[in-house]
Amino acid sequence: MAGVATPCANGCGPGAPSEAEVLHLCRSLEVGTVMTLFYSKKSQRPERKTFQVKLETRQITWSRGADKIEGSIDIREIKEIRPGKTSRDFDRYQEDPAFRPDQSHCFVILYGMEFRLKTLSLQATSEDEVNMWIKGLTWLMEDTLQAATPLQIERWLRKQFYSVDRNREDRISAKDLKNMLSQVNYRVPNMRFLRERLTDLEQRSGDITYGQFAQLYRSLMYSAQKTMDLPFLETNALRTGERPEHCQVSLSEFQQFLLEYQGELWAVDRLQVQEFMLSFLRDPLREIEEPYFFLDELVTFLFSKENSVWNSQLDAVCPDTMNNPLSHYWISSSHNTYLTGDQFSSESSLEAYARCLRMGCRCIELDCWDGPDGMPVIYHGHTLTTKIKFSDVLHTIKEHAFVASEYPVILSIEDHCSIAQQRNMAQHFRKVLGDTLLTKPVDIAADGLPSPNQLRRKILIKHKKLAEGSAYEEVPTSVMYSENDISNSIKNGILYLEDPVNHEWYPHYFVLTSSKIYYSEETSSDQGNEDEEEPKEASSSTELHSSEKWFHGKLGAGRDGRHIAERLLTEYCIETGAPDGSFLVRESETFVGDYTLSFWRNGKVQHCRIHSRQDAGTPKFFLTDNLVFDSLYDLITHYQQVPLRCNEFEMRLSEPVPQTNAHESKEWYHASLTRAQAEHMLMRVPRDGAFLVRKRNEPNSYAISFRAEGKIKHCRVQQEGQTVMLGNSEFDSLVDLISYYEKHPLYRKMKLRYPINEEALEKIGTAEPDYGALYEGRNPGFYVEANPMPTFKCAVKALFDYKAQREDELTFTKSAIIQNVEKQDGGWWRGDYGGKKQLWFPSNYVEEMINPAVLEPEREHLDENSPLGDLLRGVLDVPACQIAIRPEGKNNRLFVFSISMPSVAQWSLDVAADSQEELQDWVKKIREVAQTADARLTEGKMMERRKKIALELSELVVYCRPVPFDEEKIGTERACYRDMSSFPETKAEKYVNKAKGKKFLQYNRLQLSRIYPKGQRLDSSNYDPLPMWICGSQLVALNFQTPDKPMQMNQALFMAGGHCGYVLQPSTMRDEAFDPFDKSSLRGLEPCVICIEVLGARHLPKNGRGIVCPFVEIEVAGAEYDSTKQKTEFVVDNGLNPVWPAKPFHFQISNPEFAFLRFVVYEEDMFSDQNFLAQATFPVKGLKTGYRAVPLKNNYSEDLELASLLIKIDIFPAKENGDLSPFSGISLRERASDASSQLFHVRAREGSFEARYQQPFEDFRISQEHLADHFDSRERSTSDGPSSATNLIEDPLHDKLWKCSL
């Protein structure tokens, strides 16, 4: 998420270096110094390397020598430069006498684009060297971020070019250029496309220089986007085809554009416009009185951050708005601040506190438990999360609390400590925090909370407080016992379940409560381990070559192998334009044990023998006797870096030629298998991830048949020359493709896991096929919609949030479990959720869960309120279970016990532990629970937890005194502004609604409230904060480490005021008549209409291997009555410079003071699923109008390099008579209901279907007219229900993806 601490936090500002000093620093850093790098991996010892700054690309690089760069980081990603040894990398060597560097000789660079930052921990040779690096990098951080967009583009272009031209020869091949453009999201159809645009290539080599590359980029960006409806482009010579550098936009024309189209009042000053143009261009040849833009430069300006839709003047803190009581502000708040991942097994980290505080968070949480040596530790109690020292946390808070903001920090203490350790806590609070700790009221006579200005640079303690005159006493908590709270579990931890298909054991998180055993989906057993483990080495270094794409094994007998190698190299190099040095390695046909290196040079294939010999019983490999290698892999790696030398030439091995037919020997490949046969095989393996690959009848075409979400699906793979295509993702071979999707999801969360053939079926196949895996029956020659099988009840899991549009529909959140689902035709199903029975919901919002009655009897007990929340896989009723230890173990696991249920015949669950002690403890506790379950549950529900508070700690609590929420006190004299209440989201939802929202807002005008995620969110997901905010809750605590929409909304809310962590709530919310859920209660606010056209985008990020097909979702989020979404069409295969057809989107907003405009860029993948690419979210009150850039961010709200949308935006006031200008008489909400612009679902009306055929699934052609007739005949079973909806995946069985539009 966007780090808000500017580089000045590290020392720039009044003490910034002079121009001469900057020049000296930059030269010194460019030359570089030798420093010792401390690794994050335990297996790597510290090493001395040369570190340099590449000013052309603004990167820090390191290497052992001058030849090869081993690593680099972008300076734009640096968040903090920290002097000293404060990093985990240094901590690992505290006890190692060989590595005890002087504190003053060390510094740490923290960088990254996620919440959890990476570290570069360095030891310099002197303190002066450290100061040089810190001072120089601090200046470079600020200068890099503030650089004008054309200069940023120049640096980006050089970074891309040098990533290929590693030897700095100022030339790359056409093949390299094609691959590079693919990496930046631009599809090059063929090599001829490049040759036509690079007419001045060197005749002999065909290489491309940097200048040619930069000119090609400029041409590609402009030519693709010159069709956009923009000022200047309509009338200039561009339309006649004249090159953009021959068309100029003068200073006067640009000034007129800023005034007329952009509404920039500062542009009335001609001198300011001139200065702006000069600073943007930074072109010495145009530092003249009348600067000008070329047309392509003007378009670049429109996409630039300098033309942002956000009013940057709102980024500054306004002290005049910081004089209200704290209860009038939204305050940026974190939940379980110490965690870096999930809530049950991730690492607790000091860096999480530093990161949150530097992001402007002003309320952080300390979860304190008794620790060793009389001092508390902080972690998520009764879980596997790691522990950190309370005292270390306080020192971290002191160091980082006021870097990003000077406004007060609230420490929310979750206290589980004994009296003795509470006293030590209080002592450390005073000792470490000193004068920053608030220990007495600002104003004793006040009748409300103090203001942020009154509390500047103060730290407040939120903790329970004793009554007057008590030394210590028991105080009741407001939290009642809940079996669903993981902190009340009897035991929890990682146990292992055996996969019935491959018999591997996989970790799952188990929770034992007073009556049930809950266990999660497959998880990681080492999430708390920050260390990056080395990849597993091959069983023998001599076998490393066997998995390399350049190794082809034995190609043929005698001279056949030589001929085959020559054919493969010739075809590959001619077709792809591969450079000299392209190569493959094969087994020698003539010399047993030797190999042959075949390579491409000057349009011919040449061969070279690789000799082998035994040396002391180990093989050695060499081309010449004077340079011998331990393995074939080492030999090839060497000659990829160092040239082969002979009398005639010198040449490095460049590009490996991939194997083309290696798939034929793989267990998953079937050369002659029909679709029906493939489905029948997969029906006998009821496991997601089962797959096979089959040859299709069409030339150069294959299909992957697989199981996902309990259903069989297919996708087509196409061989195009030397490239294998899946959708728009390119691979070198089928083997490469399957290997990739064994590690990465192919469809939603499903990875290829179980290769299926006849031998596998004999071992793991069921006797009876699972016909439920097929969506529909088959009609020979034509796929039909009708399902001849009877419908059955099942459970489904929500993929997205859905809000009911009618009274007979369900409302649910993402990951909700909907029970007793009855599938209906027309895209709408019925089900039970949230106490509502058999209501409608769109089927494309959910994924079907495995039928619990078929595979896992314990799934019948699924509980949506389990302590595992969305991670839940199964539930067992402990009294109904029988436990038995298996002394002999099972399948390489020694410590195994079985859980069986007599009520379910022939069913048992084998569970493995890591040790005998762990096994015995689990079995003992489960048996105890089985005997006393009812008594334990009754005791827990009857018990009101009470807590003893130490006087020394109570005295530190001044304003934030947690007390049980009492609705009866609201608005009475008994309400005390110093008291506050905390609510889990589930309890808060009872007050942030139409019935009680106004009353809760009244409470929040005087007192603080803190909302936090429910305990079942073990995956650290977040709830929707908007209802809490509009009802006045100040401390809406979120998991900052989670990159989801709620956190992105949180970052948007606090972007005004420079991310200082305090935003004054609108004055409307302090109006006694205001009701958060009734727009008629709005007084003094003028409703508005926002009209937006999405014109184009630049530099969208990639998602996986393919070129993206992007579309843009536009959303207004805010008050319930204002929230709506619309979307554009998708653009095929272009993420570098896509253009959308002109289409206006209109949004009516009644409460613009509490409204956000949100853009999300998705790609549509081959399954018609949408995958997140980028987003940008802004408060509506800070938007500019005109032709504006929308700078895009990643899911952590970090700026994406050069990524932006270009939109045209207008904001109109509503007319007093209720009509909306300029569209009087017609509701814009109705206008916006055009089905092609609605997100996720469409209610299809009779006769309104128009099918769109998706090529990746075209196994058979069908009649569109027949299908349209078929759709028309489908109706919802009740006349008053929604008529139908469009499925994102309408027909997975038959590879048909249809979309319906009104």
Curated annotation (Swiss-Prot):
Compartments, as annotated in UniProt: Cell projection, Lamellipodium; Cell projection, Ruffle
Activity regulation, free text: Activated by phosphorylation on tyrosine residues.
Modified residues (Phosphoserine): S1221, S1227, S1233, S1248, S1263
Residues covered by the SH2 domain: 550-657, 668-756
SH3 domain residues: 791-851
GO cellular component: cell-cell junction; cytoplasm; cytosol; glutamatergic synapse; lamellipodium; plasma membrane; ruffle; Schaffer collateral - CA1 synapse
C2 domain ranges (all copies): 1071-1194
EC number: 3.1.4.11
PTM summary: Tyrosine phosphorylated in response to signaling via activated FLT3, KIT and PDGFRA. Tyrosine phosphorylated by activated FGFR1, FGFR2, FGFR3 and FGFR4. Tyrosine phosphorylated by activated FLT1 and KDR. Tyrosine phosphorylated by activated PDGFRB. The receptor-mediated activation of PLCG1 involves its phosphorylation by tyrosine kinases in response to ligation of a variety of growth factor receptors and immune system receptors. For instance, SYK phosphorylates and activates PLCG1 in response to ligation of the B-cell receptor.
PROSITE patterns membership: C2 (PS50004), EF_HAND_1 (PS00018), EF_HAND_2 (PS50222), PH_DOMAIN (PS50003), PIPLC_X_DOMAIN (PS50007), PIPLC_Y_DOMAIN (PS50008), SH2 (PS50001), SH3 (PS50002)
PI-PLC Y-box domain location: 953-1070
Active site: H335, H380
Positions of post-translational N-acetylalanine modification: A2
Spans annotated as Disordered: 522-545
Presence of keyword Ribonucleoprotein: no
One Gene Ontology molecular-function label: calcium-dependent phospholipase C activity
Complex and partners: Interacts (via SH2 domain) with FGFR1, FGFR2, FGFR3 and FGFR4 (phosphorylated). Interacts with RALGPS1. Interacts (via SH2 domains) with VIL1 (phosphorylated at C-terminus tyrosine phosphorylation sites). Interacts (via SH2 domain) with RET. Interacts with AGAP2 via its SH3 domain. Interacts with LAT (phosphorylated) upon TCR activation. Interacts (via SH3 domain) with the Pro-rich domain of TNK1. Associates with BLNK, VAV1, GRB2 and NCK1 in a B-cell antigen receptor-dependent fashion. Interacts with CBLB in activated T-cells; which inhibits phosphorylation. Interacts with SHB.
Record function comment: Mediates the production of the second messenger molecules diacylglycerol (DAG) and inositol 1,4,5-trisphosphate (IP3). Plays an important role in the regulation of intracellular signaling cascades. Becomes activated in response to ligand-mediated activation of receptor-type tyrosine kinases, such as PDGFRA, PDGFRB, EGFR, FGFR1, FGFR2, FGFR3 and FGFR4. Plays a role in actin reorganization and cell migration.
Protein name in UniProt: 1-phosphatidylinositol 4,5-bisphosphate phosphodiesterase gamma-1
Gene: Plcg1
